[in-house]
Amino acid sequence: MRTKQEYLIRYKDGSLYCELANIWIDPIKPVKRALITHAHFDHFTFGCEEYISTRETAILLKKRVGDNIKIKTFDYGQEFKINGINISFHPSGHILGSSQIRFIFAEEKWLITGDFKLQKDETCKQYEIVKTDYLISECTFG
Protein backbone atom coordinates (compact mmCIF):
# COMPACT_ATOMS: atom_id res chain seq x y z
CA MET A 1 0.00 0.00 0.00
CA ARG A 2 1.28 3.48 -0.83
CA THR A 3 0.41 6.76 0.78
CA LYS A 4 -1.31 9.43 -1.27
CA GLN A 5 2.17 10.77 -1.90
CA GLU A 6 4.92 8.41 -2.95
CA TYR A 7 6.80 9.02 0.30
CA LEU A 8 5.30 10.67 3.35
CA ILE A 9 8.74 11.60 4.69
CA ARG A 10 11.76 12.35 2.54
CA TYR A 11 15.26 13.75 2.72
CA LYS A 12 15.42 17.38 1.59
CA ASP A 13 18.10 20.05 2.01
CA GLY A 14 20.01 18.00 4.59
CA SER A 15 17.04 17.14 6.83
CA LEU A 16 13.94 14.97 6.95
CA TYR A 17 10.78 16.66 5.69
CA CYS A 18 7.07 15.82 5.62
CA GLU A 19 5.61 17.89 2.80
CA LEU A 20 1.99 17.05 3.57
CA ALA A 21 2.34 18.54 7.08
CA ASN A 22 4.93 21.14 6.00
CA ILE A 23 7.09 20.09 8.92
CA TRP A 24 10.80 19.38 9.27
CA ILE A 25 12.35 16.80 11.60
CA ASP A 26 15.57 17.88 13.38
CA PRO A 27 16.28 20.56 10.75
CA ILE A 28 19.78 21.90 10.12
CA LYS A 29 18.53 25.35 9.05
CA PRO A 30 15.77 27.65 10.35
CA VAL A 31 12.32 26.55 9.16
CA LYS A 32 8.70 27.44 9.86
CA ARG A 33 7.86 24.34 11.93
CA ALA A 34 10.28 21.79 13.41
CA LEU A 35 9.75 18.49 15.20
CA ILE A 36 12.71 17.92 17.53
CA THR A 37 13.75 14.43 18.66
CA HIS A 38 16.04 15.70 21.43
CA ALA A 39 18.06 18.71 22.58
CA HIS A 40 21.54 17.84 21.29
CA PHE A 41 22.94 20.53 19.00
CA ASP A 42 23.07 18.23 15.96
CA HIS A 43 19.28 17.73 16.17
CA PHE A 44 17.98 21.29 16.23
CA THR A 45 18.88 24.71 14.91
CA PHE A 46 18.31 28.25 16.10
CA GLY A 47 15.71 30.49 14.48
CA CYS A 48 12.79 28.17 13.73
CA GLU A 49 9.39 29.88 13.94
CA GLU A 50 7.89 27.00 15.93
CA TYR A 51 9.34 23.96 17.67
CA ILE A 52 7.39 20.84 18.65
CA SER A 53 8.85 18.36 21.15
CA THR A 54 8.36 16.50 24.40
CA ARG A 55 8.06 18.60 27.57
CA GLU A 56 11.52 17.59 28.80
CA THR A 57 13.15 18.43 25.47
CA ALA A 58 11.41 21.82 25.51
CA ILE A 59 12.99 22.66 28.87
CA LEU A 60 16.44 21.80 27.53
CA LEU A 61 15.82 23.68 24.26
CA LYS A 62 14.86 26.83 26.14
CA LYS A 63 18.15 26.63 28.07
CA ARG A 64 20.05 26.41 24.77
CA VAL A 65 17.99 28.60 22.43
CA GLY A 66 16.36 31.02 24.89
CA ASP A 67 13.04 31.37 26.69
CA ASN A 68 11.45 33.40 23.89
CA ILE A 69 11.04 30.52 21.44
CA LYS A 70 7.60 29.34 20.39
CA ILE A 71 7.33 25.70 21.39
CA LYS A 72 4.47 23.21 21.64
CA THR A 73 4.94 20.20 23.87
CA PHE A 74 3.38 16.77 24.01
CA ASP A 75 3.68 13.81 26.35
CA TYR A 76 4.96 10.47 25.15
CA GLY A 77 2.18 8.63 23.31
CA GLN A 78 -0.05 11.72 23.05
CA GLU A 79 -1.25 12.02 19.45
CA PHE A 80 -1.71 15.34 17.73
CA LYS A 81 -2.82 16.04 14.19
CA ILE A 82 -1.33 18.21 11.45
CA ASN A 83 -3.06 18.26 8.04
CA GLY A 84 -4.65 14.85 8.61
CA ILE A 85 -1.45 13.18 9.84
CA ASN A 86 -1.45 11.74 13.37
CA ILE A 87 1.92 12.38 15.02
CA SER A 88 3.22 11.16 18.39
CA PHE A 89 6.46 11.03 20.37
CA HIS A 90 7.77 7.78 21.88
CA PRO A 91 10.76 7.23 24.20
CA SER A 92 14.09 6.58 22.49
CA GLY A 93 16.21 6.00 25.61
CA HIS A 94 18.96 8.40 24.47
CA ILE A 95 18.78 11.41 26.85
CA LEU A 96 16.17 13.15 28.98
CA GLY A 97 13.17 13.92 26.75
CA SER A 98 14.54 12.11 23.69
CA SER A 99 12.01 10.60 21.36
CA GLN A 100 11.18 8.65 18.28
CA ILE A 101 8.47 10.26 16.17
CA ARG A 102 5.61 8.27 14.66
CA PHE A 103 3.48 9.49 11.75
CA ILE A 104 0.22 7.75 10.81
CA PHE A 105 -1.39 8.60 7.48
CA ALA A 106 -3.50 6.63 4.98
CA GLU A 107 -3.36 3.59 7.28
CA GLU A 108 0.45 3.55 7.11
CA LYS A 109 2.80 4.05 10.05
CA TRP A 110 6.15 5.77 9.64
CA LEU A 111 8.71 5.96 12.47
CA ILE A 112 11.79 8.15 12.78
CA THR A 113 14.05 6.85 15.54
CA GLY A 114 16.27 9.87 16.15
CA ASP A 115 19.25 8.88 18.32
CA PHE A 116 18.34 5.88 20.45
CA LYS A 117 19.77 3.56 23.08
CA LEU A 118 18.43 0.12 23.94
CA GLN A 119 20.21 -0.18 27.30
CA LYS A 120 18.34 1.04 30.36
CA ASP A 121 19.43 4.46 31.61
CA GLU A 122 18.16 6.01 34.85
CA THR A 123 18.30 9.52 33.35
CA CYS A 124 15.59 8.99 30.74
CA LYS A 125 12.62 6.85 29.73
CA GLN A 126 13.58 3.49 28.31
CA TYR A 127 13.41 2.86 24.56
CA GLU A 128 9.92 1.84 23.43
CA ILE A 129 9.36 -0.62 20.61
CA VAL A 130 6.86 1.03 18.25
CA LYS A 131 5.07 -0.91 15.51
CA THR A 132 5.62 0.63 12.11
CA ASP A 133 5.42 -0.02 8.38
CA TYR A 134 8.36 2.23 7.47
CA LEU A 135 11.42 2.85 9.65
CA ILE A 136 13.84 5.74 9.25
CA SER A 137 16.70 5.10 11.65
CA GLU A 138 19.40 7.38 12.96
CA CYS A 139 22.86 6.15 11.99
CA THR A 140 25.55 8.18 13.73
CA PHE A 141 28.32 5.59 13.63
CA GLY A 142 27.77 4.06 10.17
Regions found by a protein language model. Name each.
Residues 38:
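Conserved G/P- and acidic residue-centered "switch" motifs that form tight phosphate/ATP-binding loops
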Residues 2-10, 15-18, 24-29, 33, ...:
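His/Asp/Glu-rich metal-coordinating catalytic cores
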